């Protein structure tokens, strides 16, 4: 398929999750409606991950595409219908007998994801070492956390040009090369193993970048492996604390098997969130989630949340923007050369600011223009003028004078305050 056809096929998937309720805004949001180029709801401005959108198949497709053309093809299966790679997510179901007065009932716990290991006891141990609120039990807070991190850490628009907004053929080609590069140089999936088992495999099976660092025994020397095993101390690469004997650890092949992590310490070095499904990116001796690895390689547009592959883009307020996306957060009008105000780190044009965000003057009860001087005390504001910042009793101008605040009123003296009380 040539680049022009790829560009024509692009779309942000506006039908996905349409009308889903917002878990954050509740009834204030009319339901999810994807903005035509931002990755947010048009109604409440929250992300799709904040809405109760059923995306299990879509997420499995996204992760499946991430693992396509990598060494992790054992974690995907291609659908016969369309050939799209699907993530073979490992689901773990645990059954525990619960004693009742008459009969023994079975309590079933389903984990929406679990480490792909043959030893279920090891997988169970791994889960128990995660914070309770982050264990992906179906229908729980932990399952919602995993869903949110899948969306946040592994954005589809960081790997699939068809999920981006109006890329040029040149940008599509550059993005494909970028994705191919990080798949071959940085992408990995953690392994859950017991440290003593890894030690027993010996140095020949250890992956260490730059060669084997172990020192072979001298000729004729006897190795006391039992003594070596007893004295071995394993410490977590993140928190530096020792591993407890019998506890599982996570290894990352790209980091080398001389490094290991507690399950709860296998986190992104930037956002410090658990690496979802143990999917990591390794760079400069650090673990990253997909989002923050890409951020370390490319500028990201603060408007559309996509990586910038264009040679021309703008920088404002310590953020990067596609030229066409430096727009008012409220009305989407282009802001180049216009006056704007930052509201919660989002640029807003002057008319929208006055209409939707400006504070109201306690004196004249009109909105205060962002370019006009004002006086603020606690949550109250006034125009810094002789017409507005006045004593609430005698109308004396208080600019540059001492005053006594009482809720939304100000007084020049105790006498004036008493007269109004």
From Swiss-Prot:
Boundaries of every PET domain copy: 92-199
Protein name, as recorded: Testin
GO cellular component terms attached to this protein's record: cytoplasm; focal adhesion
GO term, biological process aspect, one: negative regulation of cell population proliferation
Basic and acidic residues bias spans: 155-164
Superkingdom, natural source: Eukaryota
Keyword Repeat attached: yes
InterPro entries, sorted: LIM1_Testin, LIM2_Testin, LIM3_Testin, PET_domain, PET_testin, Pk/Esn/Tes, Znf_LIM
Quaternary structure annotation from Swiss-Prot or TrEMBL: Interacts via LIM domain 1 with ZYX. Interacts (via LIM domain 3) with ENAH and VASP. Interacts with ALKBH4, talin, actin, alpha-actinin, GRIP1 and PXN. Interacts (via LIM domain 2) with ACTL7A (via N-terminus). Heterodimer with ACTL7A; the heterodimer interacts with ENAH to form a heterotrimer.
Record-stated family: Belongs to the prickle / espinas / testin family.
Gene3D superfamilies: Cysteine Rich Protein (2.10.110.10)
A single MF term (Gene Ontology): zinc ion binding
Repeat listed as a keyword: yes
Pfam assignment, any one: PET
Region Disordered, residue ranges: 133-164
Entry's free-text remark on domains: The N-terminal and the C-terminal halves of the protein can associate with each other, thereby hindering interactions with ZYX.
